[in-house]
Amino acid sequence: LDLGYVAFYAVGAYVYALLASPHFGIHLPFWVILPIGAAIACLFGMLLGAPTLKLRGDYLAIVTLGFGEIIRIFLNNLNAPINVTNGAQGITLIDPIRIGDFSFAETSTLLGLQISGPQKYYFFLVALAIVVIIVNVRLQDSRIGRAWQAIREDEVAAKACGINTRNIKLLAFAMGASFGGI
């Protein structure tokens, strides 16, 4: 039970905010930042997963919950001596998501209906969630997914079958973190 997903979500959000705002003067497009944010969240997932591989149940939940809290406090206090996250005020003036000339922040008309910026973001995030669900279903039916299921059912038997449980569990942490970072 991993309760640290809020930390991976925060890492992905701050990567986007830092790379798509005037805070550092970098204005990269969303499609460039998305894999960068997922990769950095994946790195944080491996950093959390490596020391916690032997924990189970309540102990794993407590450690991952603590990790989420550590990341929150760290990001809130990362404004001195170098202002990276602007502290509790956060990063402002983040660029809206654009696909070509189509901006998700502006109201537009489609088939005579007015679609506001928040509605466009909603439909975009639903589409992104559907893509993530499809990827997860495909992963579940793959060799890696079967290894995850074998480890869940009986870790000793999975080891006896030749599954490298340490690497597969670390991959599970990393993949979950990357999806959280998206």
Q: For the regions a protein language model found, what residue spans apply to each?
A:
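Transmembrane alpha-helices and adjacent helix-loop boundaries
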Residues: 1-182
